[in-house]
Design a protein with these regions (language model features):
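Conserved beta-strand signature within the Rossmann-like core of class I S-adenosyl-L-methionine
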Residues: 47, 120, 130-138
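Conserved proline-anchored active-site loop of SAM-dependent methyltransferases
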Residues: 97-112
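A short beta-strand-loop structural module common to alpha/beta enzyme folds
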Residues: 47-59
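A short glycine-rich, Lys/Arg-flanked "PGG" loop and its adjoining helix->strand segment in the class I
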Residues: 113-130
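Short strand-turn motif at the edge of the Rossmann-like AdoMet-binding core
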Residues: 52-54, 108, 133, 137-141
Length: 211
């Protein structure tokens, strides 16, 4: 459920860890339903940049709701980018001069995606604002518990801020997709999972970091 706060200047709307006052980059969003859940809660997508590795043509082949979700996001003012590779996204023409308060990567669930997590830490750290955070939502049962996400993050000078339980019902309309094979448009059971939050090591102990 979205929560609205009046900070005296403008209304700030929150959905769990995310607010309309933050500049948010969502990476690898499948059918873009997570980004749409945020934009809907905020009443605007102006603070969102939603990305996918897929081209627009491939996106529409893989996901039945992709066209609709992208259209809604763009109508709400979100920036939607296709063909964005996490390995060099900080050099992307539309991203290289952008800095974010939150960078979000949900469910890198396939085994090969462990290296993608390593890559996102390595590139996203260069795209964070002061006190910004990288959020990776990930399954926590074996074999995913063996990935050592905190260790992967530390290789990019990132420190864990918090490990928060993830409940998909907190994000109405979000449909987690397999993303590969002939079942790419099917949801998958997420089971036990958490959102792991990281910041640059030198901000980890700064009392003014949270907002």
């Amino acid at each position: 459920m979205a929560v609205t706060w009046n900070d005296g200047a403008a209304l700030t709307k929150w959905l769990k860890h995310y607010s309309s006052a933050q500049d948010i980059l969502i990476v690898g969003d499948g059918d873009f339903s997570f980004s749409l859940a945020l934009a809907t809660a905020f009443g605007s997508g102006a603070n969102l940049v939603a990305t996918s590795l897929d081209s627009y043509a491939d996106l529409n082949i893989k996901y039945s709701d992709a066209t609709s979700n992208v259209t809604k996001l763009e109508a709400m003012g979100a920036t939607v980018l296709h063909g964005v590779d996490v390995k060099d996204m900080n050099l992307h023409a539309n991203l290289q001069l952008r800095w974010f308060d939150r960078i979000v990567f949900n469910f890198p669930h396939a085994g090969s995606h462990k290296e993608l997590v390593r890559s996102i830490f390595a590139t996203a750290r260069h795209m964070l604002r002061r006190h910004g955070e990288i959020h990776v939502t990930h399954k926590t049962k074996h074999p995913y518990s063996m990935w050592g996400i905190e260790q992967l993050a530390s290789q990019s000078s990132l420190a864990m801020v918090e490990q928060a339980a993830f409940q998909i019902q907190d994000y109405p309309g979000y449909n987690q997709k397999r993303g590969s094979s002939w079942r790419c448009d099917q949801d998958f059971a997420i089971g036990d999972c958490c959102t792991f939050k990281f910041c640059l090591e030198w901000w980890a102990s700064d009392d003014d970091r949270f907002f």
